[in-house]
Regions:
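Phosphate/nucleotide-binding beta-alpha loop and adjacent structural elements of enzyme active sites
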Residues: 8, 12-310
Length: 310
């Protein structure tokens, strides 16, 4: 098994010792990898019409017309691919992307310039030497690898993803890059440790939550869970520079107990949160403001906070 991963630069993955929480490493995730992920990176390089479509969509402007044309071409590209993956560089990293059935991968493949552009700009502006970043709901690693490509060898990045198939894609993508700063952990974060039911949307494999999804076709699996504080302490974090949370409405279950129980020295300076205000059980924006955070940006999908007091 180790030899098969060696072709994909496994040094970029920090292997984890087995733990009761169900945290496991890239090599342990290999059982979840589909046959196409057993082939060397580059086996699915885009060519012909698909390559041209990707070039066109990535060059599209941010205007209304530019986006409209890009999305139309993207549909053509998806139909042409017929479910096949694509090996490509995106956001400064090499990735194998499966655009059919995962909105995140579709966006990153065809239109990375539109992918959380403001959020990424704000995050990139705050990267410094020794940057520490926790990516909660890491999906296939877009944010984690974006930060790793810019933060240098002294960074510490945790990519948290509980969905087994998506975790396998995440670890594969990490392994294709030489950064050596990203550690993938397969567990859910919640308000207490244990085992939780994770709901999965078969139409969008990157959408999973410990809260019931709006999809009528949602499936469910049991996954290990821990709290953000327990995770940070077990990893030896003394400072967290930034956190991104995209867990389909369960962001409050993670942040509320963390801000209640964690020492202030561990509170992140910068937070990107998926805007799920219609699903949160508590007023998370009010809680963040009471803890000294100010909202510095609001986009179609996310809220961005920065701590103004320490």
């Amino acid at each position: 098994m180790a030899g098969r991963w060696a072709a994909g630069k496994p040094r970029s993955i920090k292997a984890l010792a087995p733990q009761p929480l169900g945290v496991y490493s890239a090599a342990m995730a290999f059982n979840e990898i589909r046959p196409s992920d057993d082939q060397p990176f580059g086996s699915f390089a885009p060519h012909g019409l698909v390559a041209r479509i990707i070039g066109w969509t990535r060059r599209a402007s941010d205007s209304f017309l530019g986006r409209k044309v890009a999305y139309a071409l993207r549909r053509l590209g998806l139909n042409t691919l017929k479910g096949k993956p694509v090996d490509i560089e995106a956001l400064g990293a090499q990735m194998r992307l499966y655009p059919e059935g995962n909105v995140c991968e579709k966006r990153v493949l065809f239109t990375p310039q539109y992918f959380d552009a403001l959020e990424r700009d704000l995050l990139a502006a705050r990267i410094r030497e020794g940057f520490s970043f926790i990516d909660i709901g890491a999906n296939i690693g877009a944010y984690s690898l974006f930060v790793a490509a810019r933060a240098g060898r002294g960074a510490r990045i945790l990519a948290i993803e509980p969905q087994p198939e998506i975790f396998a894609r995440l670890t594969y993508n990490i392994a294709q890059n030489p950064f050596g700063t990203v550690k993938a952990i397969a567990c859910a974060l919640a308000d207490k440790p244990g085992e939780l039911t994770l709901f999965l949307d078969p139409a969008n494999k990157g959408e999973s939550s410990v809260r019931i999804l709006r999809s009528s076709n949602a499936n469910a699996v049991r996954v290990p869970a821990t709290t953000l504080l327990a995770l940070a302490e077990s990893e030896g974090y003394e400072r967290i520079d930034a956190v991104k949370l995209d867990v389909e409405g369960a962001e409050d279950l993670i942040l509320e107990p963390f801000l209640r129980d964690a020492p202030e020295s561990l509170w992140p300076g910068f937070i990107i949160i998926e805007d799920s205000r219609g699903r949160w059980a508590s007023d998370l924006p009010a809680l963040l403001e009471s803890k000294g955070y100010a909202m510095i940006a609001q986009t179609r999908l996310n809220l961005v906070y920065e701590r103004t007091t320490s």
